[in-house]
UniProtKB/Swiss-Prot annotation:
The gene is murG. It is a peripheral membrane protein. Its EC number is 2.4.1.227. It catalyses: di-trans,octa-cis-undecaprenyl diphospho-N-acetyl-alpha-D-muramoyl-L-alanyl-D-glutamyl-meso-2,6-diaminopimeloyl-D-alanyl-D-alanine + UDP-N-acetyl-alpha-D-glucosamine = di-trans,octa-cis-undecaprenyl diphospho-[N-acetyl-alpha-D-glucosaminyl-(1->4)]-N-acetyl-alpha-D-muramoyl-L-alanyl-D-glutamyl-meso-2,6-diaminopimeloyl-D-alanyl-D-alanine + UDP + H(+). It comes from the Bacteria. GO terms for cellular component: plasma membrane. Belongs to the glycosyltransferase 28 family. MurG subfamily. Coiled coil: none annotated. It is found in: Cell inner membrane. Its main location: membrane. This is UDP-N-acetylglucosamine--N-acetylmuramyl-(pentapeptide) pyrophosphoryl-undecaprenol N-acetylglucosamine transferase. Keywords: Cell cycle, Cell division, Cell inner membrane, Cell membrane, Cell shape, Cell wall biogenesis/degradation, Glycosyltransferase, Membrane, Peptidoglycan synthesis, Transferase. Gene3D superfamilies: Glycogen Phosphorylase B. It comes from Prochlorococcus marinus (strain MIT 9313). Signal peptide: none annotated.
Length: 361
């Protein structure tokens, strides 16, 4: 029975691709999960996989703080090493982030091969520093391969949950009507700024007959400020596959996970990169989609609602005015999104894991 450790923690961008890979593994595989206390994995993982947590963080501080973080990393690496030996782990799969550092270092210590997946166009710090210690660095976007020194990068795409890969119904609570559907994905980071610019641009669109689903995130005090029968606001939805598959257009941040979900659904997008994202990786992610004609980039700045309103008019206006399909700019954007998609990303990663175990590295 092959034994795999998955190290994935924190945000959905790290967690959901790892869950997609775990679901795609043969039933004969044994999976242990490594995470961090009090993060999203403690809610999603234990019902399916055995979860072990260790405290892990970055090394961004200085002086005493950095020393404490380094000692914490060493302690976490020691704990992971014991786990690897106790469980008889044969291969490690990680999606980067803080938890990847002790997992990669412990695996290196034990001589266990690692597959590291980097979903962003600009690799994270852990990937840049420790990718050289991994047997394979898989990347979601081909431009990332050039930015990973000392490692063999393989382009696999970024896995998405299986529901995104099969037809899903439109949720019943979506506003009824014949107007085009706009889905706004506020996200958990920086949702307030994005939501504010969206609300500044929506009134004319709603009056023209556009239906809007606005997923605001949990920390938006302005919910209810706009009241219109064509508008539904709620913090989040468990029916994202159905929403995106039926949406004519989405407004979203440019996290790699969100971008992959948009791509497999073929959903054109206005991307608003999170301004405080590390290394401006969301800007680089968005540029990859824009280069294929799949997305329009709007930046969050002083005149944000005017810029967003202009983009919405350019993209949704022809459909709202009933123009011929040939003049609809969303059609080539949909084709561009499909070019960005790698629908078999989970299977490609499973194949890499099988090859490592089969080679007995």
């Amino acid at each position: 029975m092959p034994r795999l450790l998955i190290a994935a923690s924190g945000t959905g961008g790290h967690l959901f691709p790892a869950l997609a890979v775990a679901e795609a593994l043969p039933g004969s595989w044994s999976v242990c999960w490594l995470g961090v206390p009090d993060r999203l994995e403690t809610q999603l993982v234990p019902e399916r996989y055995e979860l072990t947590t260790v405290r892990a963080g970055g090394l961004q501080g200085r002086g005493l703080r950095k020393l404490v973080q380094l000692l914490q990393l060493l302690a976490a690496t020691g704990r992971v090493r014991k786990l690897l030996r106790k469980q008889g782990i044969q291969t490690v799969f990680t999606t980067g982030g803080y938890i990847a550092a002790p997992a990669i270092l412990a695996a290196r210590w034990c001589g266990i091969p690692v597959v590291l997946h980097e979903s962003n166009a600009i690799p994270g710090r852990v990937t840049r520093l420790l990718g050289r210690f991994c047997q394979v660095v898989a990347v979601g976007l081909s431009v990332a391969a050039k930015r990973i020194p000392g490692s063999k990068a393989v382009v696999t795409g970024t896995p998405v949950r299986s529901a995104f890969l099969s037809p899903q119904p439109l949720p019943r609570w979506v506003p009824c009507g014949d107007g085009p559907l706009l889905v706004v994905i506020g996200g958990s980071q920086g949702a307030v700024g994005l939501n504010r610019m969206v609300r500044g641009a929506l009134p004319s669109l709603l009056e023209a007959g556009c239906r809007v689903v606005h997923l605001t995130g949990n920390n938006d005090s302005d919910v209810g400020e706009l009241d219109h029968p064509n508008l539904v606001e709620q913090p989040f939805s468990h029916e994202m596959p159905g929403l995106l598959q039926h949406a004519d257009l989405a407004i979203s941040r440019a996290g790699a996970g969100s971008l992959s979900e948009l791509a497999v659904c073929g959903t054109p997008a206005i991307l608003v990169p999170f301004p405080q994202a590390a290394d401006q990786h969301q800007e680089a992610n968005a540029a990859c989609a824009a280069a294929l004609g799949a997305a329009v980039i709007v930046h969050q700045h002083a005149a944000e609602h005017r810029a967003l309103g202009h983009a919405l008019e350019q993209l949704m206006g022809p459909r709202l005015r009933g123009n011929a399909a040939a003049s609809n700019p969303l059609i080539p954007m949909k084709q561009g999104m499909r070019k960005l998609a790698v629908r078999e990303a989970d299977q490609l990663l499973v194949t890499l894991l099988k090859q490592l175990i089969g080679a007995g590295l």
